[in-house]
């Protein structure tokens, strides 16, 4: 299939979120690696108000990915416009409105690309959070594909919500604090309403989900970061639904570790510490690029870790300033936030860090368990490296991911399935405190070999890890799906 020069140009527009960007870049690398006729230009929307280490890591990722067939263009960022939007729109509308302000930037750059006459743009590949850019694709007369960076289960729920009548989904929002369970497509077991995506709980947000479903139906295809062996029921529901565009399971799409030192000096120090720990002895706690906790919750986690007696590596981030929509940052003095003497007492068995090079850590043989927020990238990374998870979901589709991992697939143990916290805002008035006892119980289930539940989950994770690797090599389900996707790209020229 490979040829010597690119003949088909794709325009990729990823969301400014770190998790979305990482998987989108990896997807592009797979495509150009499979077919040299493809060339991809990324139009990068800069994340406003972000001066964190996460941003620096993003820059490093893009530099490392640069090659002849991949080009990265940073669209101009107007912080004043972003600040004005922040004052006008609530959190759940801000990002969408901010992305809309970049339509002219995208329009201008694509016009510049085609004006040379040497570039034939065949399609836009748009992140699920950037669907307003489909309007620009229409202006240039090219089709849009969407990269759905979450999973097939979440995609199925989006389409299912759209199929409900207004009375039905209003009834659904009113059930959210109850113990009701629902029969839903793509699931074997009844699903507690508390395990549904947090967007389904908000009457103001539900119309946005329905609008997304309608928009997705207008695409030429939907790429989903999953593989058939992991989500067979959800994939079947989507593929057999004649009202849904072609769905391409292309995962797991993750950024694999090639060089232990690629993350810098801090990562090197962390890896040296892990090198001195016994095999599968360390529980790793990390809650994503925007996950953070205040002092009360930190003390509960610290107490649980100390009481469990297990070795640990704990990523601790400081929440944004009150009322601010910011990325979490580093604590200046952890001693002030943690129980008195905690760091000294646990010095021999634990290490507390700030920002964490998550994939590098999960790949280390000393890591035996992962306390996670259940973001989908984190879930796929843990499965790839065969590290079992204790679930602590916070927002978006994370509660659904946790339910799927614990109850549907039996690949994880639970700490909490219905924890709710808006992790982008610091107002903690409605935050549920997870107790030290709950956390300790989850860690013990995860790490102790005599625990039958944990033992079973570890074996199932090992088996799924092997399946994830088979899916992406020649003859695997996702490998074949990517081949069909490339064929479809070629038909657009």
Regions found by a protein language model. Give the residues of each.
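Glycosyltransferase specificity loop/lid
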Residues: 1-493
């Amino acid at each position: 299939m490979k040829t010597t020069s690119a003949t088909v140009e794709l325009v990729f527009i990823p969301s400014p979120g770190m998790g979305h960007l990482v998987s989108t870049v990896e997807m592009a690398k797979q495509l150009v690696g499979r077919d040299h006729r493809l060339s991809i230009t990324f139009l990068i929307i800069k994340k406003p108000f972000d001066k964190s280490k996460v941003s620096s890591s993003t820059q490093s990722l893009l530099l490392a990915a640069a090659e002849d067939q991949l080009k990265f263009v940073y669209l101009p960022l107007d912080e004043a416009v972003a600040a004005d939007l922040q004052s006008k729109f609530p959190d759940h509308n801000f990002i969408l409105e901010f992305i809309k302000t970049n339509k002219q930037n995208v329009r201008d750059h694509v016009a510049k690309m085609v004006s040379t006459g040497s570039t034939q743009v065949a399609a836009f590949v748009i992140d699920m959070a950037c669907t307003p850019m489909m309007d620009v694709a229409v202006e240039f007369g090219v089709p849009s594909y969407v990269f759905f960076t979450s999973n097939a289960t979440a995609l199925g729920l989006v389409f299912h919500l759209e199929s409900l009548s207004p009375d039905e989904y209003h009834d659904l929002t009113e059930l959210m604090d109850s113990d009701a369970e629902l029969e839903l497509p793509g699931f074997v077991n009844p699903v507690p309403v508390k395990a549904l995506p947090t967007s389904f709980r908000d009457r103001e947000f539900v119309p946005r989900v329905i609008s997304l479903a309608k928009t997705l139906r207008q695409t030429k295809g939907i790429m989903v970061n999953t593989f058939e062996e992991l989500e067979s029921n959800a994939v079947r529901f989507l593929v057999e639904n004649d009202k849904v565009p072609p769905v391409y399971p292309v995962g797991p799409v993750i950024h694999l570790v090639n060089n232990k030192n690629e993350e810098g000096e801090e990562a090197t120090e962390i890896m040296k510490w892990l090198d001195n720990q016994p095999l599968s002895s360390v529980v790793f706690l990390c809650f994503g690029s925007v996950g953070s906790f205040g002092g009360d919750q930190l003390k509960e986690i610290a107490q649980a870790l100390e009481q469990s007696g297990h070795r640990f590596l704990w990523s601790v981030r400081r929440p944004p300033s009150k009322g601010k929509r910011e990325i979490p940052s580093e604590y200046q003095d952890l001693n002030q936030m943690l129980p008195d003497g905690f760091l000294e007492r646990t010095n021999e068995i634990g290490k507390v860090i700030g920002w964490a090079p998550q994939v590098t850590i999960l790949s280390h043989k000393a890591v035996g368990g992962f306390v996670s927020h259940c973001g989908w990238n984190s879930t796929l990374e843990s499965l790839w490296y065969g590290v079992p998870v204790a679930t602590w979901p916070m927002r978006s589709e994370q509660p659904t991911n946790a339910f799927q991992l614990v109850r549907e697939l039996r690949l994880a143990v639970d700490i909490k399935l219905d924890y709710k916290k808006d992790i982008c805002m610091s107002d903690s008035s409605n935050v549920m405190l997870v107790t030290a006892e709950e956390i300790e119980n989850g860690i013990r289930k995860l790490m102790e070999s005599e625990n039958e539940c944990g033992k079973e989950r570890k074996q199932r994770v090992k088996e799924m890890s092997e399946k994830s690797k088979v899916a992406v090599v020649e003859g695997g389900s996702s490998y074949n799906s990517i081949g069909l996707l490339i064929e479809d790209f070629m038909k657009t020229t």
